[in-house]
Structure formats: structure tokens, C-alpha cells
């Protein structure tokens, strides 16, 4: 199964990351002001990807993974987050390298009125960073 073609992406991938999450974890929405784009792929389990267009307020969700093996491309202008619908292994490719000294991550709370009804849970497991968003 083909996962990705670099020639199909508008920008080159600069870094690939893996994340493992337990069912019920929400990674609250975040965005990148310097234009980092993300390509999301769930390798095992199921994940709900939630995207918010920060300019128009429009939202998009898709459940991806075992039952729907597709990748989701998110342009940098959009805020994005995910919910682990099952225990999962999640991969994301990004168009900028992460700089721990100057991170380009800006948060939006998981329960922001524009997206709070898009999650399947009302009592998620949140990291300290996501609780502080």
C-alpha cells in the first residue's frame, strides 16, 4: 500500500514523527504561524482528526486508521488536533523541523465552542500542555 508521494505535496516533508496514544486521549487543536503543513496517518487503531479553518471558522473531521486508511493533509493556516478513538499509533509528516528553542505551536482549547461537539468524548485524557491551552 502506498502511503505518500512527495511529488503530490505542495511543500517538501522535513520531519516525520510517531505518537502512540491511549483511547480517549485528545491532542487539543494547535496551529503553526510560520506555515508548517502537516500530513496525518494512523498506522494502527483509529483516530479522529479535527481541523478548524482559523479564517472562516469552518471545521472538518475524519476518522482515519484501520477502518479508513487515508492520510489527511492540513495546510498551516488551519488549527488541528486529534482524538484517539482506540489505542493507536499515529504518524505525522511536517514541512518544518521542530525547534525546541523556538517552537511554532499555538494552542486552542479542546472544548472551544467551534469544535467541542466534534469530539466523541466529553471527558478526554489531556496532557498538561493541552490542559493549559
Language-model regions: role of each:
Residues 67-85:
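Conserved SET/PR-domain catalytic core that frames the SAM/AdoMet-binding pocket
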Residues 1-70, 87-133:
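Non-catalytic, conserved peripheral segments adjacent to functional cores
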Amino acid at each position: 500500500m502506498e502511503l505518500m508521494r512527495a511529488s503530490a505535496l505542495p511543500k517538501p516533508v522535513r520531519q516525520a514523527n510517531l505518537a502512540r496514544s491511549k483511547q480517549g486521549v485528545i491532542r487539543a487543536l494547535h496551529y503553526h504561524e510560520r506555515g508548517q503543513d502537516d500530513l496525518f496517518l494512523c498506522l494502527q487503531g483509529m483516530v479522529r482528526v479535527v481541523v478548524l479553518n482559523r479564517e472562516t471558522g469552518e471545521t472538518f473531521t475524519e476518522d482515519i486508521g484501520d477502518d479508513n486508511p487515508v492520510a489527511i493533509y492540513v495546510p498551516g493556516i488551519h488549527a488541528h488536533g486529534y482524538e484517539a478513538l482506540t489505542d493507536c499509533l499515529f504518524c505525522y509528516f511536517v514541512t518544518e523541523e521542530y525547534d525546541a528553542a523556538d517552537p511554532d505551536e499555538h494552542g486552542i482549547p479542546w472544548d472551544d465552542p467551534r469544535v467541542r461537539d466534534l469530539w466523541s468524548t466529553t471527558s478526554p485524557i489531556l496532557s498538561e500542555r493541552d490542559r493549559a491551552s
